[in-house]
From Swiss-Prot:
Its cofactor is Mo-bis(molybdopterin guanine dinucleotide); [4Fe-4S] cluster. SUPFAM superfamilies: ADC-like, Formate dehydrogenase/DMSO reductase, domains 1-3. GO terms for molecular function: 4 iron, 4 sulfur cluster binding; metal ion binding; molybdopterin cofactor binding; oxidoreductase activity. Probable multiprotein complex that likely consists of DmsA, DmsB and DmsC. This is Putative dimethyl sulfoxide reductase catalytic subunit A. Mo-bis(molybdopterin guanine dinucleotide) binds at N200. It comes from Halobacterium salinarum (strain ATCC 700922 / JCM 11081 / NRC-1) (Halobacterium halobium). The lineage of its organism: Archaea, Methanobacteriati, Methanobacteriota, Stenosarchaea group, Halobacteria. Keywords: 4Fe-4S, Cell membrane, Iron, Iron-sulfur, Membrane, Metal-binding, Molybdenum, Oxidoreductase, Signal. The keyword Secreted does not apply.
Length: 837
């Protein structure tokens, strides 16, 4: 069966969406009407176009954190247009271009229509080598598909044990589904990006403060940012990727007099708004933060009261072994959270609990009962002294005066903060930056005050929905969790268990964000059965044995929450799923019925949502249906007003129980992280292969996609037509590369062919190709073939930016433009131009 049978062809889309598919092929309304005019429906289409709409209140649901409310205009059962819904609350007013293009996501030529089975697959003879771009599929009935999936689950458990099942879900849908409930009931393993993707910064911050998890830490709510006097945006292009939520608050702060510093190697939309742009060399972020600390120490700009009362800066450290002095050596009954400090008034040590201020020495060295001790802050100051701005300026590619200005603004202007995002942690040892900036903010006392900022993601705890035991039902078998960094070995080597069955959803994992893609493809060949549920036929579904067509967000009812604004949205169904697509909830319910858990899933998903709404006093169906969005908490919140979550209740300026990081370019015995220490792998100037691969390679986020979602939307492809390599003209001309030529980007792991684009806003020595493109979008190779899947011992996070490459002009055969009508080669949008239905 061909892909034109597997996917929604252009003619199919037009039949299902009529003129709702306006512009699907990039031709606009008139061409759409002309294409539809192969029957007597053209007149009806025009009449429908001029009719009246029903406005359905729903919401966008990707992993951008927005969950923006949308008005969907429906006529004759078809979506005609999408507009931004405008709630009354200022905290939630902006949508983006992506949300306005959902028409072309619902009525898209890549839509999966029916359940499919790979023709060369059977339970007894899976033939995994037949998976891939050339795999052929045949249509099967839903009952047959669910029977095959359920039988595969039971067979794997029977022959290899319950942990032979692997459940995978990405972040492609922010709604509440039955996925987690089913996997808990059935058991097995689940992979989880808690370790593996974008977790470095949060890990480092958490280790110092005891707060947050492994992603971005808690911070003041966005509506409090207006009180900031200095905002440092570190490694994030908020004004391109998060403007609908975060940008307005930063602009409000600037209008109120705040200084905006942007640390980014690329001149971004956000850098353009800065009072001070620091175009740092990639991988030098910890160097810069330590230089700022050195300046603050040298000029006595640190917050003494905060350091004494809310950090372990005055804690006494043994010089012989680096451990904190034991409180029991000073008093017989020390408080649980006590630290030993030196009281300058009494001239003796004493033990004090958290949140205690007093005449405690911040610096100094003493001998107590024959043991030489110094304060934790003394050790930190000694470490920072090796990184004065004048020395770091050359290392980081910055002006020393600019480093000093940034440090001075942060330390002296009043409350402020540092707003990192995930990009700054996309290096092998990126967690050290998390430790470093958390410590830097402790020096300036920027915790627990109005105007403090600690992350790009504001924290609205009240926006969560209480789901009770829905995701942890009674009698559940439970699942074991493996971070993405361990799943590759799990699949490749069967360590620690043989994995034979995989169910995936909400994810295009093999198209985006899984480095060393070929290793993943090889590892998945050890699976007997791969099942994937998706809206579209993606690079990942092409590796499946059974494909289940999922419904678009506008075809399902759901509730949406997010921790980054104080609102909850109700996703109303605009129309039923097209063709035989199904809401993931009903797919899970169908499997549950076959696996003996049917009684755990109500027949109607609305009954589940009704249970959640009735259990939450803030919500009512009347309000949800009328407005689509309900504000759950609009009170500005200041984070870190209570004791910190560390053992001492204080920020750990000096960590005597620090982990030892091990990995490339580090000593054989590793590096202990009592205080921040700049660690680098491939970004280091003296990296072993730096001469062979002299260019650092980033893959930043694009404002035209959320990961790989929206990569197949024709309207957006008219603007962002194909992958390109941002390269500084100096680097290009040195290699004989003209602007617009196709180039081969390569290293010892792989290569990709893309079009070169001169960009003066990217510094020499650095190149970039935005992430999120599908495999078919590249002329040859793949972006993720270049990235190492190696992770460090402590960080355990994929280091997408820790990558070096060389760039050469591509072969002559690749120099012709292979993109037609804004569609990539091989896409359904192009391949079905002349199809028959």
């Amino acid at each position: 069966m061909s892909d034109t049978d597997l996917n929604a062809t252009r003619r199919d889309v037009l039949k299902s969406g009529a003129v709702a598919a306006v512009g699907l092929s990039g031709g606009g309304l008139l061409s759409t009407l002309q294409e539809a005019d192969d029957s007597d429906t053209a007149g009806d289409a025009v009449t429908s176009f001029l009719g009246e709409d029903q406005v359905v209140k729903t919401a966008c649901s990707p992993n951008c954190r927005g969950k923006c409310p949308l008005d969907v205009f429906v006529r004759d059962g078809q979506i005609k247009k999408v507009e931004q819904q405008v709630p009354a609350a200022k905290t939630f007013k902006r949508g983006c271009t992506l949300g306005m293009t959902h028409l072309q996501r619902v009525y898209n030529a890549d839509r999966l229509k029916y359940p499919m089975k790979r023709t060369s697959w059977s339970p007894d003879d899976p033939q995994p080598d037949q998976r891939g771009a050339d795999a052929q599929f045949e249509r099967i009935a839903w009952d047959d598909a669910l029977d095959l999936v359920a039988d595969g689950i039971q067979r794997a458990k029977r022959e290899y044990g319950p942990r032979s099942l692997l459940w995978h879900s990405g972040s492609g849908d922010g709604g509440i589904t039955g996925y987690r409930r089913l996997k808990e009931l059935v058991g097995g393993l689940q992979d989880d990006f808690t370790y593996g993707i974008d977790t470095n910064v949060g890990q480092g911050f958490n280790r110092v403060t005891g707060e947050g998890g492994v992603f971005m830490p808690p911070t003041n709510t966005a509506d409090d940012w207006v009180n900031a006097e200095t905002i440092i945006i570190w490694g994030s292009d908020i004004f391109a990727s998060q403007f609908q939520m975060d940008a307005e608050w930063i602009l409000d702060a600037k209008r109120n007099g705040a200084k905006l510093v942007v640390v980014d190697p690329v001149y971004t939309n956000t850098a353009e708004k800065a009072d001070l742009w620091l175009p740092i060399k990639p991988g030098k972020d910890t160097h810069l933060a330590l230089a700022m600390m050195q300046y603050i120490f040298e000029h006595d700009h640190y917050d003494e009261a905060f350091l004494r009362s809310r950090t372990n800066a005055p804690a006494l450290v043994r010089a012989d072994d680096g451990t904190l002095l034991d409180p029991a050596s000073v008093t017989a009954t020390p408080p649980e959270d006590g630290i030993v400090v030196f009281n300058t008034e009494t001239g003796s040590p004493e033990v004090v609990p958290a949140e205690t201020n007093g005449p405690f020495a911040l610096f100094g060295e003493w001998t107590i009962d024959g043991t030489t001790v110094h304060t934790g802050l003394t050790a930190l100051r000694e470490q920072a002294s090796s990184y004065p701005p004048q020395a770091v300026a050359d290392t980081a590619g910055l002006a020393a005066a600019d480093i000093e200005t940034a440090a001075d603004w942060l330390a002296t202007r009043g409350p402020g903060g540092i707003m990192p995002s995930y990009g700054v942690g996309r290096y092998l040892y990126g967690h050290v930056f998390g430790q470093t900036y958390a410590t830097l903010l402790a020096l300036t006392g920027d915790y627990g005050r109005h105007g403090n900022i600690h992350a790009q993601h504001p924290s609205y705890d009240g926006s969560y929905l209480e789901t009770g035991d829905w995701n942890d039902p009674d009698g559940a078998a439970g699942v074991d969790t493996y971070g993405y960094n361990r799943v590759l070995d799990l699949l490749a080597n069967g360590d620690p268990v043989q994995t034979k069955f995989m169910y995936g959803m909400n994810s295009n994992m093999l198209g985006n964000q899984f480095p060393e893609r070929d290793r993943w493809l090889d590892a998945m060949s050890n699976l007997d059965t791969v099942v994937w549920a998706d809206i579209y036929h993606t690079p990942t579904t092409r590796q499946a044995d059974i494909i289940l067509p999922a419904a678009h967000w506008f075809e399902t009812e759901d509730l949406l929450t997010t921790y980054t604004h104080p609102n909850l949205s109700y996703r109303t169904k605009a129309h039923d799923p097209l063709w035989e697509a199904r809401d993931d909830y009903y797919i899970m319910a169908g499997l549950a019925q076959r696996l003996g858990h049917g009684d755990k899933f109500p027949d109607d998903k609305h009954d589940v949502l009704d249970r959640f709404v009735k259990n939450d006093d803030r919500l009512s169906w009347d309000a949800l249906r009328e407005t689509g969005t309900v504000a759950t908490d609009e009170t500005p919140t200041v984070a870190y007003t209570d004791e910190f979550g560390t053992e001492s209740g204080r920020i750990t300026v000096y960590d005597d129980d620090a982990p030892v990081e091990e990995g490339p370019a580090l000593p054989d015995d590793g590096v202990s992280l009592e205080v921040p220490k700049p660690l680098e792998a491939r970004t280091a100037d003296d990296w072993a292969h730096a001469d062979e691969y002299p260019l650092l390679f980033m893959q930043k986020h694009s404002k035209w996609r959320i990961h790989s979602q929206w990569a197949n939307v024709p309207w957006l492809r008219e603007i962002n037509t194909e992958p390109q390599l941002d390269i500084h003209p100096k680097d290009a001309t040195r290699r004989g590369i003209d602007d617009g030529e196709y180039v081969r980007v390569h290293n010892d792991r792989g290569s990709v062919v893309v079009r070169a684009k001169y960009n003066d806003g990217i510094q020499p020595g650095l190149v970039n190709t935005d992430q999120g493109w599908w495999a078919r979008d590249f002329v040859d190779g793949h972006l993720q073939d270049l990235i190492s899947a190696e992770t460090a011992k402590v960080g355990r996070t994929f280091a997408f930016y820790d990558c070096r490459v060389e760039v050469t002009r591509a072969a002559d055969e690749h120099q012709s433009n292979e993109y037609t009508q804004h569609n990539p080669r091989g896409s359904s949008g192009t391949a079905t131009d002349g199809d028959s239905s």
